[in-house]
Regions:
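Substrate-binding cleft and catalytic face of glycoside hydrolase catalytic domains
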Residues: 1-170
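Hydrophobic residues embedded in beta-strands of well-ordered beta-sheets
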Residues: 22, 309-313, 359
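Structural beta-sheet core signal
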Residues: 43, 95, 135, 198, ...
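Noncatalytic carbohydrate-binding groove/subsite architecture in carbohydrate-active enzymes
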Residues: 109-237, 247
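Aromatic/acidic polysaccharide-binding cleft in carbohydrate-active enzymes
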Residues: 202-300, 307-308
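Carbohydrate-binding surface patches
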Residues: 295-333, 341-343, 364-371
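Solvent-exposed beta-strand/loop surfaces of large extracellular or lumenal domains
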Residues: 340-356
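C-terminal beta-strand-rich structural cap/linker in extracellular carbohydrate-active enzymes
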Residues: 351-379
Length: 379
């Protein structure tokens, strides 16, 4: 909530051009902490979701032009040093969040939001033509809503440098299909250069209503091995990111690092999903992609090598109980290391099993992730 407009510009009636109308201190510290972690920033201009009985900020601004001017001053603070600010070159600026979640995020109809987006995005882009202005972080991918947004941008000349949306599902196929649908629709609407940002996503195999209202159900959905943080979620995570390598998506942002939806518990102990992200991150040390293939929809492989010729392989097995026979050509199998992520092991070494020159991966849980780091080339 520290990035919310009302946190920085607390008095909506104040002068938008007066530096004293802005309070940046906490937001400055928050973003500085993110940058110290080496994280690039995507700044959401708007307000946070309101789960309270009353709604305080999830309403359309009274003056769209003034609201855009406030955003411009915030961008100036972080990119141009205005008002004791910084030169951080934050490139991505997202307008609003989940406007189709009407009660919690936008207490007006969607058509009014789209009009608001057109006014604000165009005004910001005129001032900062080199920045990426986009949004609006729809709750899910809805082709009709996307076409409405694209039509308004074409009508007004407003930018749609990136289109963002969210997704919570346990369906890998749907996660891979969404970017393809978004790309097709945007191309048809005349926006072939618009980036695709699925910038809030997570494995979710529960019932939303029960999850929000039944405490025991919610606890089980969070703690179980087939729940939000368990081995199924971990294998889902690596399966999705593997599949995205062959699709049109520009950026995917996993939700999130902290507590309930995150990769650590309240004691900072990592969940299974942490180790899945770690394995995928380690694979990026081998950036030259190598060809892989699988004859099973629920088993996905991703391989790469480094400039020295050493390779690595990530194997994601989502709800698969059958052993996997893996042939690896041109590799020295005698020195192979195999790490396994399952219900018991957290990306820890296990003894490789070979049969007829193939590596045999035997599932030990409903889902598994294996990582083979630093596979040396054969002689």
């Amino acid at each position: 909530r520290l990035v919310d407009i009302q946190q920085i510009f607390c008095n909506a009636g104040a002068d938008a051009d007066d530096p004293s109308s802005y309070y940046f201190r906490q937001t400055d510290d928050y973003i500085a902490n993110c940058r110290r972690c080496g994280t690039d920033i995507i700044y959401r201009l708007g307000t946070s979701i309101e789960h309270s009985n009353e709604r305080y900020y999830s309403y359309p601004p009274d003056d769209y032009e003034k609201w855009a001017d406030i955003c411009i001053h915030i961008i100036r603070h972080y990119n141009e040093g205005w008002n004791n600010g910084f030169n951080w070159n934050i490139r991505y600026w997202e307008i609003w969040n989940e406007p189709d979640l009407h009660d919690n995020m936008w207490n007006a109809d969607l058509e009014e939001f789209i009009r608001f987006y057109g006014i604000v995005a165009a005004r910001i882009k005129r001032r900062f033509p080199k920045l990426m202005i986009g949004g609006p972080a729809f709750c899910g991918l809805n082709e009709h809503q996307l076409r409405l947004l694209a039509a308004e941008c074409r009508r007004t000349g407003a930018p749609l440098d990136f289109f963002s949306w969210h997704s919570y599902t346990a369906d890998i196929g749907w996660m891979l299909e969404q970017p393809r649908i978004a790309r097709r629709v945007l191309d048809e609407c005349g926006f072939p250069g618009t980036e695709l940002h699925l910038n809030e996503w997570h494995y979710f195999n529960a019932d939303w209503r029960q999850y929000r209202n039944d405490r025991l159900y919610c606890r089980e959905a969070n703690r179980a091995m087939d729940g939000l943080h368990g081995i199924d979620s971990a294998a889902f995570l690596t399966s999705v990111m593997t599949g995205w390598q062959d699709g049109p998506i520009t950026m995917g942002c996993y939700y999130t690092a902290g507590l309930c939806w995150g990769v650590f518990d309240k004691y900072a102990v990592p969940y299974k999903t942490y180790y899945a992200l770690k394995a995928f991150g380690n694979l990026t040390d081998f950036p030259l992609r190598r060809r892989t293939g699988s004859d099973r929809e629920n088993v996905r492989l991703l391989a790469g090598c480094d400039p020295g010729g050493n390779a690595a392989l990530l194997v994601s097995s989502f709800k698969n109980a059958e052993p996997i026979e893996l042939g690896i050509s041109g590799a020295d199998l005698s020195a192979m290391r195999l790490l396994r992520l399952d219900c018991e092991l957290d990306l820890e070494p296990v003894e490789p099993e070979f049969r007829d020159g193939k590596l045999i991966l035997t599932p030990t849980a409903s889902s598994n992730v294996w990582f083979l780091p630093g596979i040396a080339a054969g002689k």
